[in-house]
Regions:
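Short, charged low-complexity intrinsically disordered segments located at boundaries
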Residues: 73-82, 98-103, 147-148, 182-189, ...
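N-terminal transmembrane-helix/juxtamembrane module of multi-pass inner/ER membrane proteins
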Residues: 1-79, 121-122, 126-132
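Hydrophobic alpha-helical transmembrane segments
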Residues: 11-15, 79-82, 101-106, 171-178, ...
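Membrane-embedded catalytic cores of phosphoryl/pyrophosphoryl-handling enzymes
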Residues: 3, 127-238
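Membrane-helix interfacial "entry" motifs
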Residues: 1-9, 63-70, 92, 96, ...
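Membrane-spanning helices that line or support transport/gating and their immediate boundary helices
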Residues: 30, 105, 117-121, 199, ...
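Membrane-interface loops
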Residues: 48-54, 83-167, 171-175
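Alpha-helical transmembrane segments of multipass membrane proteins
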Residues: 19-24, 111-115, 184, 209-214
Length: 238
């Protein structure tokens, strides 16, 4: 078992580092294209594709679809993500996993700070092509909702997946995290408050940050500096 563990850990670590690098490369590529104005036509086409053909001022679909989009977009808002993160941190503290709680706090708070700095740095205006379906207070690139959804849901999904012994349940947990992240991002374009490239960039840099934090947490767990998941009552199963 020890031999298998020694061989497996570096493989997963290298794969994770590769994914972090790929996500950062994607973000940098999108940012470069946006700054050069190469994505303007593509952004415009995709945004209008989600609007009514008869009246582009209206989002596609009936009123209940628009209401669902607002519900989905709220899942990436600061209030919802703060409450969710606080609940998880509270659970970890009650479970005696103080260092794990600190790691989650650093991951989410660090992502929020990074998102704010990137917005200030790029200072891209919001779309004015269609009316906004949600109130906005900051600049457009990258999408803060999309980025923070990726940071929070992927980080928490990875945390829960480590506790679970079943491969199928691990896949399910990570799939739910990805689905929530995608729904938040698509809703931002649907509501006309972000260009598609804002969302894609938010996903890319958010995933990179979440993966990096997950790799660091795994490393600290192996060194005993962060409490490992409690798997004493679970056995790996398919």
């Amino acid at each position: 078992m020890k031999i298998g563990t020694v061989r497996t850990v570096p493989i997963f670590a290298l794969a994770g580092i590769g994914l972090v690098g790929a996500s950062l490369w994607l973000f940098i590529s999108i940012a470069g294209e946006v700054m050069e104005g190469e994505t303007a036509a593509w952004d415009r086409r995709l945004l209008l594709a989600l609007r009514s053909a008869a009246d582009p001022a209206l989002p596609w679909g009936p009123a209940w679809v628009q209401e669902m989009a607002r519900d989905f977009t709220a899942l990436g808002g600061v209030a919802v993500l703060t409450l969710m993160t606080a609940a998880v941190i509270g659970y970890l503290l009650f479970a005696g996993k103080r260092h794990a709680a600190i790691a989650i706090l650093v991951a989410v708070a660090g992502g929020l700070i990074l998102s704010s700095l990137l917005k200030l740095g790029f200072d891209r205006p919001r779309p004015e092509l269609v009316p906004h379906g949600s109130l906005v207070y900051t600049t457009s690139f990258p999408s803060g909702h999309s980025m923070m959804a990726a940071v929070t849901y992927l980080t928490l999904g990875a945390l829960l997946a480590r506790v679970e012994g079943s491969i199928r349940i691990r896949i399910y947990l990570l799939s739910v995290a990805v689905l929530l992240t995608v729904l938040v991002g698509v809703s931002r374009v649907y509501l006309g408050v972000h260009w598609p490239t804002d969302v894609a960039a938010g996903w890319a840099v958010g995933a990179a940050w979440a993966l990096l934090c997950s790799l660091v947490m795994s490393r600290l767990q192996r060194r005993g500096e962060v409490e490992p998941p409690d798997t004493t009552t679970r056995s790996p199963r398919c």
